[in-house]
């Protein structure tokens, strides 16, 4: 159900975002407690502000009300993905070269399933993370298809 909803919402949202020159980062349709939430995460080269989120929310809400593809009552939230934005597409990895990332894999690679470090390289098939293990710097090559989830990581 959730995948069907997000696919439908993506089809409805994309023309709105294209008109505003915004990027669709992710869509979530989740139940938290008794309530359902439809979360749409948007971004652009220069980030997004509250006015852009409001424009997308109003336009998308109108389309959703017309088509009525979701049977449950839900809250629509449109926002920026934040500082720790998810890396979902290959283009996200390319744009994030040199930045700190946090990544989980489906199966262990070099004995680990969790990686945090600098995104050093991405060739479209393999992600190379430069990380510190104990006191040594280490480069780990992770096949793209083995990545369960990835996001930017804020370090202090």
UniProtKB/Swiss-Prot annotation:
Pfam families: DUF150_C, RimP_N. Gene3D superfamilies: Ribosome maturation factor RimP, C-terminal domain, RimP-like superfamily, N-terminal. The keyword Transcription does not apply. One of its GO terms (biological process) is ribosomal small subunit assembly. It is found in: Cytoplasm. One of its GO terms (cellular component) is cytosol. PANTHER family: RIBOSOME MATURATION FACTOR RIMP. NCBIfam families: PRK00092.1-2. This is Ribosome maturation factor RimP. The gene is rimP.
């Amino acid at each position: 159900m959730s995948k069907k909803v997000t696919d439908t919402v993506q089809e409805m949202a994309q023309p709105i975002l294209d008109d505003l020159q915004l990027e669709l980062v992710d869509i979530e349709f989740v139940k938290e407690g008794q309530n359902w939430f439809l979360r749409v995460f948007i971004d652009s080269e220069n980030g997004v502000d509250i006015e852009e989120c409001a424009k997308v929310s109003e336009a998308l809400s109108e389309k959703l009300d017309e088509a009525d593809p979701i049977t449950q009552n839900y809250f629509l939230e449109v926002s920026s993905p934040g500082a720790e934005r998810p890396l979902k597409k290959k283009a996200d990895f390319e744009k994030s070269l040199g930045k700190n990332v946090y990544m989980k894999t489906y199966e262990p690679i070099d004995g680990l399933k969790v990686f945090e470090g600098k995104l050093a390289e991405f060739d479209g098939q393999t992600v190379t993370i430069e990380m510190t293990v104990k006191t040594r710097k280490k480069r780990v090559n992770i096949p793209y298809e083995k990545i369960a989830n990835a996001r930017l990581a804020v370090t202090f």
